Regions:
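A cross-taxa feature marking solvent-exposed loop/turn segments within ectodomains of secreted
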Residues: 15, 44-46
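Short, structured beta-strand/loop micro-motifs enriched in basic residues and often containing a Trp
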Residues: 15-23
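Intrinsically disordered, low-complexity Pro/Gly/Ser/Thr-rich segments with frequent PxxP/GP/PP motifs
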Residues: 23-44
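Glycine- and charge-enriched low-complexity intrinsically disordered segments
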Residues: 48-87
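Hydrophobic residues positioned within well-ordered beta-strands of beta-sheet architectures
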Residues: 6-8, 20, 39
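Charged, amphipathic alpha-helical segments
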Residues: 1-5, 45, 53-55
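Asparagine-centered strand-capping/turn motif at beta-strand->loop junctions
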Residues: 4-14, 62
């Protein structure tokens, strides 16, 4: 099986920190003003990604079977459980 990769980037210019939540793992990352977060989504079957926003948070819902690698401003934040396929 060969994984496909989708890169999704979130940039914040808010004057306040922005909380980004990656579901279904409930992984929270707090972005300081001017920061960016890269999500490298690994998958073999494409499906729907959903996003919910408000001024204080940004929620990204990924689809079943995918995995994700995170990097904030180029620094790897990937924790091992994020590389386990989502339910």
């Amino acid at each position: 099986m060969t994984d496909k990769t989708l890169e999704y980037r979130i940039h914040t210019k808010n004057p306040e920190p922005l909380t980004v939540i990656i579901e279904p793992w409930a992984e929270e990352v707090v972005l300081s003003p001017g920061s960016s977060l890269s999500l490298n989504i690994l998958y073999d079957k494409e499906d729907l990604m959903e996003v919910e926003t408000n001024p204080n948070y940004y929620v990204v819902w990924l689809w079943g079977g995918c995995r994700v690698k995170l990097a904030m401003n180029g620094e790897d934040l990937t924790r091992p459980f994020l590389l386990t396929p989502s339910p």
